[in-house]
Amino acid sequence: MDFRVSREAFLRVLTHVSSIVDSRSTIPILSNIYLKCENNQIEIRSTDMDISIREFVSCDSTKNGEATVNSRILTDIIRKTKKNSIVKLKLEGNRLIINSDNSVFELNALSADEFPKFVPLDPTNSFDLTIPQMKRLFNKTKFAISAEETRYYLNGIYFHTVSNGSKTALRCVATDGHRLAKTELDLSNNVNISGIILPRKFILQLDRILGDFEGKVKMICTDTQVSLEADNFIIISKLIDGTFPDYEKVIPVSNDKLLQVEAESFFNAIDRVSTVNQDKTPTVKLQFENNSIKIMATSTDSNKGDEEVAASYAAEALEILFNSKYILDLQDVIEGETMILELLNQSSPVIVKDPKDATSLYILMPMRI
């Protein structure tokens, strides 16, 4: 294997591929990335046995070949080389020689035969989305993914299709048991996804990587795996093997008290008042009455803060306690200037809606007063 490659193009792909590599893996080959040079193209792969990534980059090759080398070391070397330079890589026996300007590096290379194979998914159940559409679906819901490993079936986004009139919609739902986020997108083709759970790690990897691509992505779903393809990039992930709860049952249908408030003012007030509460579970008490919201916070060491925000509210007075962090997490998903809260009583779930986005809905569970 002998090739020359642009430092920028090579580093871009290495950054993508190395993002899933576990440097602490007890299986040495999994700390490596796979390199294959063939016909002026480099194939670069990595896997942690749950997620696999493959990407191609153009090069000027004089000899084909393949090998695996330590992912972190190779990526760091290329990152520290001179910008806009040409990097030369050559395999000599079990050593990968790297040349850049006046620098020369030698890395130990393991046989490519030991590296796990990459098997693309059957594209029978596939559909195309634009990258902004894909990012929007994930960004609207990922904040509600549970990090509690004992409830592993909540450690991802529930992905399924629903009938939306004459169209099919792709719906994403996430919940940690204290809040829920739901959004959907109409599809142009009649794909059928009965219900799969995309792992949190897969979602976060895509969030880091998709910003480097433009145009469309192809998503393929099977009963056990999911893949996403964009340009010369493909990522495949195992699905979470579990049953997502019936989320429809926790969406209230009788919340009859409506409140509308200017979103930025509301979030800023929550942020200011909650500053006094540095407890592990920061709380704020909201009093709804007479076209206003009174926001109050008290910490275990007797710090206090309160602020009143104007709102449109004509129902009976109500007092509800919330985790302030859960409210503030909504700041990144509310697009409109105002937001709507649908209330029932101090112990029932609260529905949060964005007048500018009819496709999304959020649920907040109150805390005990």
Question: Can you describe what each PLM-predicted range is?
Answer:
Residues 1-369:
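Structural preference for solvent-exposed beta-strand-turn elements
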